[in-house]
Amino acid sequence: SLSSDRLNMPHMPTSGVSGVDLYLRDPQGRWRWVANGRPNRQSDNTTTLISGLDGREHEAMVYFPLYNGVTQLSIGTMQGTDIQPLPRDETAKKPIVFWGTSITHGACASRPGMVHTAILGRRLNRPVINLGFSGNGRMESEVAELIAELDAEVFVVDCLPNLKAPEVKDRVPVLVE
């Protein structure tokens, strides 16, 4: 079930605004897109994203809707199978943190897995924290202080579309410090 009955936008399809993407890791370790679940109403949507698996263990990743909230999600499996969380890896890679605009958030992406932050996370095999704020990626020092508390491998700041040149000139030195 979704939090809003607004499933799409004039400039963005249901598959991105309200859909879910399923990816499976292939035998070579690459993430492969399997399916997109597109709702046709706010609640009681049912779809099969994959069937006929070979009985082996598979690693899966689900991307949630870019703009609509999920209030309930159930995942069904064939009788005799189950879903297990991955064990916590104490040597896990630190995340890439993206801070930016609606573009960073995923505006106009056709599907949740097609946002550039998600693509980079899969290709680099790293967790991603997406802090894209529609119209509000403005390099504020208060937000920078909070983001600096994150233990990240790298920070990617992509706020330029929300700022004018004088603001960039004033805020970048403070941000870097």
Give the label of every model feature segment.
Residues 1-95:
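N-terminal secretory targeting modules
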Residues 136-177:
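Alpha-helical cap/lid subdomain in secreted, periplasmic
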Residues 2, 100, 157-160:
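Short loop/turn segments at strand-loop or loop-helix junctions that form parts
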Residues 28-30, 104, 136, 163:
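Surface-exposed, flexible loop/turn segments at secondary-structure boundaries
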Residues 8-9, 105-108, 163-167:
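A generic structural signal for short coil/turn motifs at secondary-structure boundaries
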Residues 14, 112, 116, 171:
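Short acidic-hydrophobic sequence patches enriched in Asp/Glu that either
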Residues 53, 60-133, 137, 141-149:
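Serine-esterase "nucleophile elbow" of acetyl-processing enzymes
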